Amino acid sequence: MKKETKEWSQIAKDDREIAIEMWKTKRNVYAVMFWQQAVEKIIKAYIVESIDALPKKTHDLDVLLKQAKLDITKLPFSNVKELSLAFTRTRYEDLSRKHYMKRSVVEPLVMMAEKLYLWIEKQLK
């Protein structure tokens, strides 16, 4: 595994650990924000390792998945747009209150992010 891949993977792992802790402590806004970041960074690790390219400087998971040439259509979800939006929305108090205060709204995003993260991590090994 390349040095840069290891760095991206470690940052992704750290973000995942924070996301899990935030979810356990019912800090929904931070949970979804860190899950989005964990997924973004594990995709970037995959791009560095498998595509041998620099990942695009974006938070848009669709763009990164396309660059990585990862086909998620066989996963139980295929629309990661809402998870991509989460990073931007959580950065603004009015948007984070509007979208991510209810656990019932955040839970599907957390579950999707965890499945996607683990699937991409498996592709890396």
Residue ranges and their predicted role:
Residues 1-125:
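Terminal alpha-helical segments
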